[in-house]
Each structure stands twice: as structure tokens, then as C-alpha cells.
């Protein structure tokens, strides 16, 4: 068996959250998909994956997520999709250290899938490009390519047109109201705004940021409305994605932490800084540098 420096080595990889700093719905395509303009930014807070590549050919994950069969786990789906795409016979054991809420609108599952693709592409030495990994990722979820590419991005169309963006790296207080929101229900709602005019990124960055889904989510989910109303007393605040997470923006960590301290202990919340280069990209570069392989 050939020598493979990364096999049986335990490695740690971040799986960061994202925020939609704005989200506009511009119309619908002929096949019913919504056309969007949205700005993705990563934050320096998220899950962590400990990954050990091996020769088994199998992908194992711990801990098991209650109520989610292995075949439905996005980490497993990402790893096996990569195996199939690259005709790869290596395996891996992946341990998920879960911090981000499921279904919160901050990209937890999509980020896990992207971290799996990026890490195993490196550990299995497949040398696939970001374009190839993003193509695999798109079949797993619409937001996966953003996490794979690892740069803040302005997304258009049905979310597939990505261009790099460089918004200010502010501090955020992210709060998760204790409700689960089905994205499909929001996009199907008859009162959803679907005719916001398209604008270029520079115009959008200089205009007040809005999430077109927010009005409907606040109407349907009183917990979200209550939390947003509370945050808006202190700072510009809005919904990310279709929720349920909401966020307030601040110019300093201390300001954000002061407001966090006023929240009830029963409320799930965290403070994080926006990052235009994903912590995942930075970790990959560190591993590549340490092994003297070109980036």
C-alpha cells in the first residue's frame, strides 16, 4: 500500500456559521424557483469536525444524530458523493462537535457538508478544484457552494451565481428563537414580497439592509417577532435566511456582549465577528503549508 501522509492522522476542521446580511426576492423563474439577491458572510463561530482518514472505504460518523438515519446525514452524503465522484477507495471516521442549531438559517448542515468535502479532498489527496467541490456540494444543498469556496459572496439568480464580496466585518449578536421554520412554507406564502427590483452590489451595500422573508416570518412566528423587536431597541437587527435566527450588528465585541448579558439564560445566543474569508479556508491553508504542498 502506497505511503499516504494524511491517513490515520487526526485533523480538526471548523464548520462556521453564515449570515445573510440582506435577502431580496426579485421574481420567479418559469419552473417556480425564486430569484434572489443575497449577501453571505461567515462568522468566527460554528461546529467543528474531527476527521481521521483511513483505508477502510467506509465513512463512519459519531455521534449519531437522533432521528436522522446515517444515509440522511449531510456529512455522510457529502463524503460518499466525493468518494463516488473521485472513484476513491479511502474511508474516514468523522466526529461532529455540534454547536450550531439545526434549521436556524445560519447554514449549519450546509457548512458541515462543505467542511467534509474540503477536508476529505485534502486528506484523501484528490486534488479536486473548488469548482468541482462546489458542483458536488450544490446537489446536497443550495448554500453548500458558498461554504466550499470560503469567501463572502453576493449571490444572484436562484443562488447559483456567486461573486466575491467584501462587506465590513462587524460584530454580531445572533439569537435563536426556539422555533423551527420550514423554508418551503415561507417561500410558498401568498403575501411574500416577490418583486423587489434588482440592484447592483454597490447600491445594495449603501442602502439599508432588508430581508424580504422577515415580514412573513414575524407574522407567522410570534417568538421571532418578539426577539427581533427586543434587539431593534439596541441596534440594526434582522432575520437571516428564513430564520429562525435573528441578528443585531455592532461595531465592537464589547457592545454586542453587553446586550448578550441582558438576554435570559433560556435564550440560545452567541456573539461572533463577521469573516470575509472562512475559517475553513484558513485551516486548509495551514494544513497545506505545514505539509509543504502548494495551495
Swiss-Prot record:
Pathway: Isoprenoid biosynthesis; isopentenyl diphosphate biosynthesis via DXP pathway; isopentenyl diphosphate from 1-deoxy-D-xylulose 5-phosphate: step 3/6. Disulfide bonds: none annotated. ATP binds at residues 101-111. GO terms for molecular function: 4-(cytidine 5'-diphospho)-2-C-methyl-D-erythritol kinase activity; ATP binding. It holds the Pfam family GHMP_kinases_C. This is 4-diphosphocytidyl-2-C-methyl-D-erythritol kinase. It comes from the Bacteria. The active site is at residues 18, 143. Catalyzes the phosphorylation of the position 2 hydroxy group of 4-diphosphocytidyl-2C-methyl-D-erythritol. Its EC number is 2.7.1.148. Belongs to the GHMP kinase family. IspE subfamily. Keywords: ATP-binding, Isoprene biosynthesis, Kinase, Nucleotide-binding, Transferase. GO terms for biological process: isopentenyl diphosphate biosynthetic process, methylerythritol 4-phosphate pathway; terpenoid biosynthetic process.
Amino acid at each position: 500500500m502506497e505511503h499516504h501522509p494524511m491517513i490515520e492522522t487526526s485533523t480538526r476542521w471548523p464548520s462556521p456559521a453564515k449570515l445573510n446580511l440582506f435577502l431580496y426576492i426579485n421574481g420567479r423563474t418559469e419552473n417556480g424557483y425564486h430569484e434572489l439577491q443575497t449577501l453571505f458572510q461567515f462568522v468566527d463561530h460554528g461546529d467543528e469536525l474531527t476527521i481521521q482518514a483511513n483505508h477502510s472505504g467506509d465513512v463512519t460518523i459519531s455521534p449519531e444524530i437522533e432521528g436522522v438515519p446515517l444515509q440522511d446525514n449531510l456529512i455522510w452524503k457529502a463524503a460518499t458523493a466525493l468518494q463516488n465522484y473521485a472513484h476513491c477507495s479511502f474511508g474516514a471516521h468523522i466526529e461532529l462537535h455540534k454547536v450550531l442549531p439545526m434549521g436556524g438559517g445560519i447554514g449549519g448542515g450546509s457548512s458541515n457538508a462543505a467542511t467534509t468535502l474540503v477536508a476529505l479532498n485534502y486528506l484523501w489527496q484528490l486534488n479536486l478544484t473548488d469548482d468541482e467541490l462546489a458542483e458536488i456540494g450544490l446537489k446536497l444543498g443550495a448554500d453548500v457552494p458558498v461554504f466550499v469556496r470560503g469567501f463572502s459572496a453576493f449571490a444572484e439568480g436562484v443562488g447559483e451565481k456567486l461573486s466575491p464580496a467584501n462587506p465590513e466585518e462587524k460584530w454580531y449578536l445572533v439569537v435563536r428563537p426556539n422555533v423551527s421554520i420550514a423554508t418551503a412554507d415561507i417561500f410558498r406564502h401568498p403575501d411574500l414580497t416577490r418583486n423587489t427590483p434588482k440592484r447592483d452590489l454597490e447600491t445594495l451595500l449603501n442602502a439599508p439592509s432588508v430581508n424580504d422573508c422577515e415580514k412573513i416570518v414575524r407574522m407567522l412566528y410570534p417568538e421571532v417577532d418578539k426577539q427581533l423587536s427586543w434587539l431593534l431597541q439596541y441596534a440594526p437587527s434582522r432575520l437571516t435566511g428564513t430564520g429562525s435566527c435573528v441578528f443585531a450588528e455592532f461595531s465592537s465585541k464589547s457592545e454586542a456582549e453587553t446586550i448578550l448579558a441582558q438576554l435570559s439564560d433560556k435564550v440560545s445566543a452567541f456573539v461572533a465577528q463577521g469573516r470575509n474569508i472562512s475559517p475553513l479556508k484558513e485551516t486548509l491553508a495551514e494544513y497545506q503549508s505545514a505539509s509543504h504542498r502548494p495551495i
